[in-house]
Design a protein with these regions (language model features):
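Conserved alpha/beta catalytic core and glycan-binding cleft of carbohydrate-active enzymes
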Residues: 1-92, 120, 130, 134-137, ...
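Aromatic- and carboxylate-lined catalytic core of secreted/periplasmic carbohydrate-active enzymes
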Residues: 97-133
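Short hydrophobic/aromatic beta-strand or adjacent loop that forms the aromatic wall/cage
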Residues: 137-139, 149, 200-205
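Solvent-exposed beta-hairpin/edge-strand motifs
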Residues: 168-183
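C-terminal beta-strand-rich structural cap/linker in extracellular carbohydrate-active enzymes
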Residues: 188-209
Length: 209
């Protein structure tokens, strides 16, 4: 009791295409007011910590957190995830918080802080329309849109660089997008994204100009 590794297996997918389909499917399970208030967790006191499940790779935690903070709902951080605390199944997932800051992953913490600032600064990331744009075996892209503000989130979950060429959806040719996570710019050409390659196991949060 309390071990949830078998909970909702239909929502877990190892492919980008399946993952994006599941993200869209979840949005239709409940009325939108409920969706926007739902608590979105990567882990909790009842589960192994995400960082441990993924073999201690902070890149994967960053990717998951990027989705968590750009998906409809209320992202919730389990204490210590932001500094790299690990832990297996309950009770190991309830380790004491490491108050000694020399034990923290400060780059990871800064990444969490950046996502928090961006979500607070841009209402489209909180309550905007969710539009799937494209997917492949190891990558997904979706758009959040509200009152003319558009943001495109791209996830590269492969061990190789990924050139973003997905369809740009409602974005017009000539649109330039700036990655708010610092990886450069993309543009829209002939209805598709161009001009930006993501390093392995990284994501982009692109703001349309």
């Amino acid at each position: 009791v309390g071990h949830w590794e078998g909970h909702g297996p239909q929502y877990f997918s190892t492919s980008g295409t399946g993952f994006l389909a599941n993200l869209e499917k979840l949005l239709h399970l409940y009325p939108m007011p409920a969706v926007l208030a739902q608590l979105n967790l990567l882990d909790s006191h009842d589960t192994a910590r995400f960082l441990s499940i993924t073999g201690g790779d902070p890149r994967l935690l960053k990717l998951a957190t990027l989705v968590q903070f750009t998906y409809p709902g209320a992202p919730s951080i389990y204490y210590g995830d932001e500094v790299g605390v690990e832990g297996g199944q309950d009770p190991d997932c309830r380790r004491s918080f490491p108050w000694d800051e020399s034990r923290w992953d400060h780059k990871l913490r800064s990444y969490f802080q950046l996502l928090i600032r961006l979500r607070l600064a841009h209402p489209a990331l909180r309550t905007g329309e969710f539009i799937p744009l494209g997917s492949s075996e190891d990558a997904v892209a979706y758009l959040r849109r509200l009152d003319g503000a558009c943001f495109v989130i791209v996830i590269n979950n492969s061990d190789a660089p990924f050139h973003i060429t997905f369809p740009a959806g409602p974005l017009a040719d000539g649109t330039v997008l700036q990655d708010l996570l610092g990886k450069g710019t993309a543009r829209v050409e002939n209805g598709n994204f161009a001009g930006l390659a993501l390093p392995p196991r990284t994501g982009a949060l692109l703001q349309a100009g």
